A protein has these predicted regions:
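N-terminal small/polar loop signature for handling phosphorylated ligands or for N-terminal nucleophile
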Residues: 107-145
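Catalytic or ion-coupling anion/metal-binding cores of large enzyme and transporter domains
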Residues: 1-68, 74-78, 82, 91-110, ...
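Acidic/charged coordination and interface sites in well-structured regions
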Residues: 88
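A short, small-residue-rich loop immediately preceding and capping a beta-strand
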Residues: 142-163, 174-178
Length: 615
């Protein structure tokens, strides 16, 4: 199947835009790859330090037999349910390496925080920046420079992008990502959301709410909604950086350990065969476009409009939100997974999962098939589904959807477009995810109410003032503007705690929307939200010009976000300043002082909110 012309056009434009930076990056990759193995050129003391802790037989394999040594970078901790299974992975991987004449070492650990724990709490202000801290930690782990290849153990929101950014700075190393899978299904995401809305209204108490949350999040594995963590896994499949079909096998399933061992065999196959497939070559412009398409086709997390900009830049590739929007116009929505539907990721996997999606996109010419992957048989391998037969892993073609209420073919999708829209106007540039928003909510016009924090909005809801404003302003609704939430202001926290109160008011028939320079969770959906507004208010963005009472238009169909203020008045308005109380409290306590440099150096959301790339 020929590549879709829009896909080809966007890819060419990215290649042209990135020519200088990508050329420079690949020169560095090739220079590093051309060096002799560092173990052979290191001093004896260096070598002794590097392998002092290894069993004698492993030392012989590395030093005398010159076998491959694989560096493992792990995000293990047992606070994150998704990462708890990684506790035993290093032993499994080391055992598999020895079976093939190789060795493996845990090169280092990286921090991994759970956004579910920190939602609405001060710790959430470190969430986005933890991505770059993880990238730096990955670099520290690999900088011992004694490894022939690497395995990355991570799953969740900022962890995978951080590991990927870090790995791309060691682009000469063959690298495979190793996930742990989702938890089995508990209380449905729909039922959980209903209880949250009841709690927001005060109709159920803490005991009932806690019982519902415990029933939803109940064991090891990722959360079962299709948020940022599970979107990460879909994108890694589309980039060819996983063992095919490994994303959504539950931690306790028989396939899981076999797939983990296969990850070691896969990375060793690259080192043994001398097939030049280091991660810096695998992740090229076509690979990045494939990831963008997979995100759109599955209704994935809006967080990736920040993260994958940063990931691409780590490989010398420059993408922007125009690229996403143009792809979204031609990429069909093939999946309905909560919050874009009622199914969870286990039902998605049962219906065909990533293998089905990728096979459909390849057949429709909506993914590049002529790309390097960690598998010798290329992108076609990722359109297949693994299963166990007589104790061995086998892969079958994806075939037909197992449930057309969850997965549909590209010829008969849920929607002809991917459900992400770029919004532009006198407010700047932002994005909106419309795949989960009812169609009658894609366009609204209502007065703004400006809030300086999410706590202010919560207080207005709880007091009844927000509903009263909806009733009395003649527009039956409010556009809630929450500013000072960008990367430079406070680290750009997710504002997921605002979803239940806004959803309650929308459920009562009011026209509600959120406009912010902050982020929303990958699990947020049914309330229209213009997010990631750039430039942010603290950087002098137009968001700082909005005043409560300004009439606002949000139109996802036409891509418009506009404050209906005359051009003369708008241009003459002074920018609001961050309140002194926020200045005093932002970045203080719970270690936030340590990230002052991150806030100071952070680029805009559309530039990936990078703290390590200074323009």
């Amino acid at each position: 199947m020929a590549v879709h012309p829009v896909l080809a056009q966007v890819t060419r434009r990215i290649q042209e835009r990135s020519h200088a930076t990508r050329t420079d990056y690949l020169e560095q990759v090739d220079a590093m790859a051309a060096r002799p193995p560092q173990v052979r050129s290191m001093g004896c003391a260096n070598v002794a330090h590097a392998f002092a802790a290894l069993p004698g037989a492993d030392k012989i394999r590395i030093v005398e037999e010159k076998g491959p040594n694989i560096g493992i970078v792990t995000a293990y901790n047992d606070v994150l349910s998704a990462h708890a299974p990684f506790a035993r992975y290093p032993d499994i991987l080391k055992d598999e390496a020895r079976r093939h004449g190789a060795t493996a070492q845990v090169a280092g650990g990286v921090p991994a925080m759970c956004d579910g724990v920190t939602q609405g709490m001060p710790g959430m202000e470190l969430s986005l920046f933890s991505r770059d801290a993880i990238a730096m930690s990955t670099a520290i782990a690999l900088t011992h420079d004694t490894f022939d290849a690497a395995l990355m153990l991570g799953v969740c929101d900022k962890i995978v992008p951080g590991l990927l950014i870090g790995a791309l700075h060691f682009g000469h190393l063959p690298t495979v990502f190793v996930p742990a899978g989702p938890m089995t299904s508990g209380l449905s995401n729909h039922e959980k959301a209903k209880v949250r809305e009841l709690a927001a209204q005060g109709l159920v108490g803490r005991q009932e709410l806690l019982a519902a949350e415990n029933a939803a999040y109940h064991e090891q594995g990722t959360c079962t909604f299709y948020g940022t963590a599970n979107s990460n896994q879909m994108l890694l499949e589309a980039m060819g950086l996983h063992v095919p079909g490994t994303s959504f096998i539950n931690p306790a399933e028989a396939e899981r350990e076999l797939l983990t061992r296969e990850a070691m065999r896969t990375v060793l196959s690259i080192t043994h065969s001398k097939r030049f497939a280091p991660i810096g070559r695998v992740v090229d412009e076509r690979c990045i476009v494939n990831a963008m398409v997979a995100l759109l086709a599955t209704g994935g997390s809006t967080n990736h409009l920040i993260h994958w900009v940063a990931v691409a830049r780590a490989a010398g590739i420059i993408i922007d939100w125009d690229d996403f929007e143009q792809l979204s116009a031609v990429v069909p929505l093939l999946a309905r997974i909560y919050p874009n539907g009622s199914a969870d990721v286990n039902q998605f996997q049962k219906a065909g999962g990533p293998g089905y999606v990728i096979a459909q996109l390849l057949q429709a010419g909506l993914m590049h098939d002529d790309v390097l992957t960690v598998r010798e048989d290329g992108m076609a391998a990722f359109g297949r589904i693994p299963h166990v037969e007589n104790g061995s892993l086998l892969w079958n073609d994806a075939g037909a959807s197992g449930d057309d209420g969850v997965l549909r073919p590209a010829s008969a999708p849920f929607s002809p477009t991917g459900g992400l829209k770029l919004l532009k106007g006198n407010m700047g540039r932002s994005v909106i995810k419309v795949s989960a928003v009812p169609e009658d909510r894609h366009h609204l016009r209502a007065p703004a109410w400006v809030f300086d924090s999410q706590d202010e909005l919560q207080a207005a809801f709880k007091s009844g003032a927000l509903e009263q404003a909806c009733q009395s302003n003649g527009h039956n609704g409010v556009v809630c503007v929450v500013r000072w939430q960008g990367p430079q202001a406070n680290g750009m926290p997710e504002l997921h705690k605002l979803t239940p109160p806004l959803a309650v008011l929308q459920g009562k028939g009011y026209k509600m929307a959120l406009v912010t320079d902050g982020r929303m969770s990958g699990a947020s959906g049914k309330v229209p939200a213009a997010i990631h507004l750039s430039p942010e208010a603290l950087a002098g963005g137009p968001l700082a010009k909005v005043r409560s009472g300004d009439l606002m238009t949000l139109n996802a169909s036409t891509g418009q976000l506009q404050a209906e203020v005359s051009e003369a008045e708008w241009s003459s308005r002074e920018l609001a300043q961050m309140p002194d109380a926020l200045k005093r409290s932002n970045g203080r306590g719970l270690g936030r002082e340590l990230f002052a440099g991150f806030r100071r150096n952070a680029l805009s959301a559309e530039e990936g909110a990078c703290t390590w790339l200074l323009n």
